[in-house]
Curated annotation (Swiss-Prot):
Glycans are attached at residues 227, 235, 252, 263. It is a multi-pass membrane protein. Disulfide bonds join 242-412. This is Neutral amino acid transporter 9. It catalyses: L-leucine(in) = L-leucine(out); L-tyrosine(in) = L-tyrosine(out); L-glutamine(out) = L-glutamine(in); L-asparagine(out) = L-asparagine(in). Changing residue 81 to W: Increases arginine transport. Deacreases affinity for arginine.
Length: 549
């Protein structure tokens, strides 16, 4: 009787991994042919022939009680989703509705979903990275890093397919790491994933402080009819400035001269509206309460703003390049007064930025699950990376080439290229305001992801209590405030966090998993070992280069 009372839709355990979904390969429902359904009622009576077939399913269920997956019914005997019925011990059958299945996207939607996910704050630092590496070497590094990260992402995507006799349809990359390396693999992937998320939140805090400062400054100057002239900048309608020409690049503000009705008003405003001394603390009042929301579904509605902001940035870059023209002069190894060499030893700073700019490895499996044509996953992933790489090249090359040298030196290009335009620039003001609102809605989403990953692993609950969540949020916000106060250089923050999380999730873990999988199948060759070992060394060198270059 105990055997008969077991539900026919019971899940099949597979070692330490347990799947709890309606996937037909994992769940073993009872199938009733349409001709064996008697009547058209909501609860349709099952014929005697169907009842006999039910007994066979009971027999299979006894076999599948074993941990050996080979005793499970073969996949080809499981009917298609639209023909599945669930048999009840009461003698009734219910048709499984397909409405709860995830919507599959065409390839074009999948490609732009990947593009939109990768287009983050790193795009603002690409021109600065090209300046650090040199114009020619910078372009080469963008192409090479795009190819390397694409291959590693391909290895992540294929990692679930190389595991035999286990249903991996709902697995993520941390599950794959746990399968191959146990608890160490799972926790290491989790820690480095948190590094990338918290690093992004710190960059967001610095940028939001920057955008709020410049937005408030624009409004104040407009209301009080104050004209500011930066001491270091070009003349003309399309002004470009050099905020830190001869001072510490992590200083608080650029040199500005006020002219208006009341100079003391401007000085008082600067005292209470400081980019590093006050603005980072003002943001606490706005963002800390938002982080404590139990659900982030409200903020998820504004994710489309990311696409709009990137499109506007592309328009802004194109317009500025047309207005300013190109200013290039090639010096291959020696610098001049206004230009940098084409090849510089600071190139690891660009590779660190690009590691995060091309980083999507921790969620690529999830994104590709919704692709309508799974056989095109590799092609769509490659096209998405091509689109991302072209976007970075377009923005980086145009800003670097259009930067007016002379009279300004290329060394003046800031880690956030919007800082090279005065706060009075209307088009840049629109970009800053738009990005400020967009980041205000995305920041709680990032905090929610940090909470889900960390609290879910430690407490088994995404919201164990208000106190736990509040302490975590205070820690994350505190990290952002400290960086915005003492080190507001988003280029360096991005490159350090990118190189650190990229070492594990981009270079080491995908390569090790692929080599271990080949070794277990007896297919590992010395050429594969050499190539993937070289990738691991590149990841280590990329991280070390951030500290020594």
């Amino acid at each position: 009787m105990d055997e008969d009372s077991k539900p026919l839709l019971g899940s099949v355990p597979t070692g330490d991994y347990y799947t709890d979904s309606l996937d037909p390969k994992q769940r073993r429902p009872f199938h009733v042919e349409p001709r064996n359904i008697v009547g058209e009622d909501v609860q349709e009576r099952v014929s005697a022939e169907a009842a006999v077939l039910s007994s066979r399913v009971h027999y299979y269920s006894r076999l599948t009680g074993s941990s050996d997956r080979l005793l499970a019914p073969p996949d080809h005997v499981i009917p298609s989703h639209e023909d599945i019925y669930i048999y009840s011990p009461l003698g009734t059958a219910f048709k499984v509705q397909g409405g709860d299945s995830p919507i599959k996207n065409p390839s074009i939607v999948t490609i732009f979903a990947i593009w939109n996910t990768m287009m983050g704050t790193s795009i603002l630092s690409i021109p600065w990275g090209i300046k650090q590496a040199g114009f020619t070497l910078g372009i080469i590094i963008i192409v090479l890093m795009g190819l390397l990260t694409l291959y590693c992402c391909y290895r992540v995507l294929k990692s679930t397919k190389s595991i035999p006799y286990v249903d991996t349809s709902d697995w993520e990359f941390p599950d794959v790491c746990k399968y191959y390396f146990g608890g160490f693999g799972k926790w290491s992937s989790l820690v480095f994933s948190l590094v990338s998320l918290i690093g992004a939140m710190v960059v967001y805090w610095v940028l939001m402080s920057n955008f709020l400062f410049n937005t408030g400054k624009f409004i104040f100057n407009y209301v009080h009819n104050v004209n500011t002239s930066d001491a270091f900048g070009t003349n003309g309608t399309e002004r470009v400035i050099c905020p830190y020409p001869d001072v510490d690049p992590h200083g608080n503000s650029s040199t500005s001269l006020y002219s208006g009705s009341d100079n003391s008003t401007g000085l008082e405003f600067d005292h209470w509206w400081s980019k590093t001394n006050t603005i980072p603390f003002y943001l606490i009042l706005l963002l800390l309460p938002l982080l404590n929301f139990r659900s982030a579904s409200f903020f998820a509605r504004f994710t489309f703003l990311g696409t709009i902001s990137v499109i506007y940035l592309i328009f802004l870059v194109t317009y500025k390049a047309i207005q300013l023209g190109f200013h290039l002069e090639f010096h291959w190894f020696d610098s001049s007064m206004f230009f940098v060499p084409e090849f510089r030893t600071l190139f690891p700073q660009l590779s660190g930025v690009l590691t995060l700019a091309f980083f999507i490895h921790n969620c690529i499996i999830t994104l590709m699950k919704n692709n309508k044509h799974q056989e095109n996953n590799v092609r769509d992933l490659s096209l998405a990376y091509l689109l991302v790489g072209l976007t970075y090249l377009y923005v980086g090359v145009l800003i670097f080439a259009a930067f007016p040298s002379p009279p300004l030196s290329k060394e003046c290009i800031e880690p956030n290229f919007l800082d090279n335009f005065p706060s009075s620039d209307i088009l840049v003001f629109v970009a800053r305001t738009f990005l400020l609102f967009q980041m205000t809605t995305v920041y709680p989403l990032l905090g929610y992801l940090v909470r889900v990953q960390l609290m879910g692993q430690i407490f088994g609950n995404h919201y164990p209590g208000f106190l736990h969540v509040f302490v975590l949020n205070v820690f994350v916000v505190g990290a952002g405030v400290l960086m915005a106060r003492f080190y507001p250089n988003i280029g360096s923050i991005i490159r350090y966090s990118g190189a650190l999380c990229g070492l594990a999730l981009v270079f080491v873990l995908p390569s090790l998993i692929h080599m271990v999988s080949l070794k277990r199948r007896g297919e590992l060759r010395w050429t594969s070992t050499l190539f993937h070992g070289f990738l691991i060394l590149l990841g280590v060198a990329n991280l070390l280069g951030q500290f020594f270059m």
